[in-house]
């Protein structure tokens, strides 16, 4: 009985921690997509695309980094590869100039958050 209660408590704690991480990623993806949309006057469909793209980026980064004892250099490589993949994905929907403008807008909002 005691083991069952401990297991249930452990599952709940893991669930809450996972939700907290997902909420952070959702908040960032929302912030980035909303800011870029207002700055560049993008459509709601474009905003949804940006949101989905950034959320996928953040989730993938977390999976590659979280819980692993990586050096700063290894993390930088993951972030760089993630950025390159993001640019490729954005280029499937937007032209190069629009992609650069989106990246600049996101950098601007990211710098404001610091």
Question: Where in the sequence are the language-model features?
Answer:
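Bacterial Sec-dependent N-terminal signal peptides
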Residues: 1-25
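Charge-rich (acidic/polar
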Residues: 21-114
């Amino acid at each position: 009985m005691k083991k069952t209660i401990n297991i249930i408590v452990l599952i709940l704690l893991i669930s809450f921690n996972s939700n907290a991480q997902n909420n952070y990623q959702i908040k960032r993806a929302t912030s980035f997509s909303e800011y870029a949309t207002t700055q560049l006057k993008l459509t709601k469909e474009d905003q949804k695309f940006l949101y989905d793209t950034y959320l996928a980026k953040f989730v993938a980064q977390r999976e590659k980094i979280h819980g692993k004892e990586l050096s700063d250099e290894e993390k930088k490589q993951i972030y760089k590869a993630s950025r390159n993949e993001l640019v490729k994905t954005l280029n499937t929907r937007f032209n190069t100039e629009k992609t650069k403008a989106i990246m600049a807008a996101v950098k601007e909002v990211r710098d404001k958050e610091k």
